[in-house]
Amino acid sequence: MRTIISFVIFCVLFFPNFVNAENSGNKWSFYTGMFDFSDDGKKSNLFGIQHINEDLYRETSFGTFQPVTGAFITADNAKYIYTGFQIPKKNGSFTFTPSFTPGLYDEGDGKDLGHAIEFKTEIQISFEISDQSEIGLSYNHISNASLGDKNPGANSYMFNFIKVY
């Protein structure tokens, strides 16, 4: 896990941009944190990556809907791959971003969430550190909405680094 995190940090910080980042419309979020922190028996470190396409959006009365796609893996080899939307609300250098992303979950050696189909709801607060970078903190809840026989859910927190590429 440390090797993966070190490699991603190296790429993010030192890999040259081959496109004009200001006009690309593509953001990547790299995050790490604690999966299911509220369950002492099953909590686990996690690492994930998420793509945010700012060029594909829909204006609604709720705000700007942007598509997101991503995945994470835990130290217990649980995996979640997802796609959905987020609604960023910018206020100065801060951005508040709720999101909803259905996805597929594989428990690996981690927590059994009761079904392969899971729904992730998340809130994130980020701070713009440059025109092309943000740091943030997020909290999410993953649940199968009672699709399975059991629905224990999982609560997680993450530290995010978001960069325009």
Regions flagged by a language model, labelled:
Residues K43-I49, F127, P152-Y165:
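Outer-membrane beta-barrel "beta-signal"
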Residues F94-T121:
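Mid-chain, well-packed structural core segment of small domains
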Residues F35-N45, A71-Y82, D109-A116, S146-A154:
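Solvent-exposed loop/turn segments connecting transmembrane beta-strands
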Residues H51-D55, I87-K89, F127, H141, ...:
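Residue-level signature of outer-membrane beta-barrel architecture
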Residues F18-G25, D40, D55-F65, K90-F96, ...:
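Short loop/turn motifs that connect adjacent beta-strands in outer-membrane beta-barrel proteins
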Residues M1-G25:
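Cleavable N-terminal export/targeting peptides
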Residues K27-D36, F62-T74, T97-D106, S138-S143:
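Transmembrane beta-strand segments that form the barrel wall of outer-membrane beta-barrel proteins
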Residues I49, F85, F96, I123-I125, ...:
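Membrane-embedded beta-strands that build the outer-membrane beta-barrel scaffold
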